[in-house]
Amino acid sequence: MNVKVYNLDGSEKGDIELPAVFETEYRPDLIKRAVISSLTAKLQPKGCDAFAGYRTSAKSIGKGHGKARVRRTAQGAGAFVPQAVGGRRAHPPKVEKILFERINRKEKLKALASAIAASAIPEIVSARGHKIEGVPSLPLVVNADFESLAKTKEVLEVFKTLKLDADLARAKDGIKIKAGRAKLRGRKYKKPKSVLVVVGDACEAIAASRNLAGVDVITANDLSAIHIAPGTMAGRLTLWTENAIEKINGRF
């Protein structure tokens, strides 16, 4: 299957043959497992002090006194039990708990291939919430000159030319302050995902693109299901460079 390659000014440069990975069967079940596996790999096992809440001289006076048989201090305050101040936790976290969801290597590669193929299907991309009206084609491939862009305003001009600015506006307008304790824990804002830019190798365009709302940039060799299907939902609007297409062809 061939698709158009676009210059930075929006004109057509020519055609490029897509790798066979873009014709992979859509498997949302595998994609979900692969993304969850990547997310859980970041979790750190945690536990508590084995004697937390146990370091007390409180004793139970036993039954027959008309009061709960809770261990009490000399002053009569409850201790040791979960419902008492300074008592142990009822069900503390265990370091033995298995947090990482394992996935076979071939399944993980199949999930990535399926997610890449889904990014080229307009119905799936649109169902994910992306604004693709006016986008020339899916998958969207641009000239390798894109990788030499060093300024964010230059990248933004290319996005406007390729009609990707509507999706950037959607992501920017969707930034909201979260409710609850998350605001105090370094994750104050809910930030929608916008365009994913896939480049061939490390280049200046990485720093120039990533400051745009919702935009992520990744090299073709580092691309995984968590990038192209964030939140386990496939169909992310993706911009490929010519070099990235060649690199992807080498991975599959």
Curated annotation (Swiss-Prot):
Disulfide bridge partners, by residue number: none
GO molecular function: rRNA binding; structural constituent of ribosome
GO biological process: translation
Tree of life domain: Archaea
Record key words, sorted: Ribonucleoprotein, Ribosomal protein, RNA-binding, rRNA-binding
GO cellular component: ribonucleoprotein complex; ribosome
Pfam families assigned: Ribosomal_L4
Subunit structure: Part of the 50S ribosomal subunit.
Function: One of the primary rRNA binding proteins, this protein initially binds near the 5'-end of the 23S rRNA. It is important during the early stages of 50S assembly. It makes multiple contacts with different domains of the 23S rRNA in the assembled 50S subunit and ribosome. Forms part of the polypeptide exit tunnel.
Family: Belongs to the universal ribosomal protein uL4 family.
Name assigned to this protein: Large ribosomal subunit protein uL4
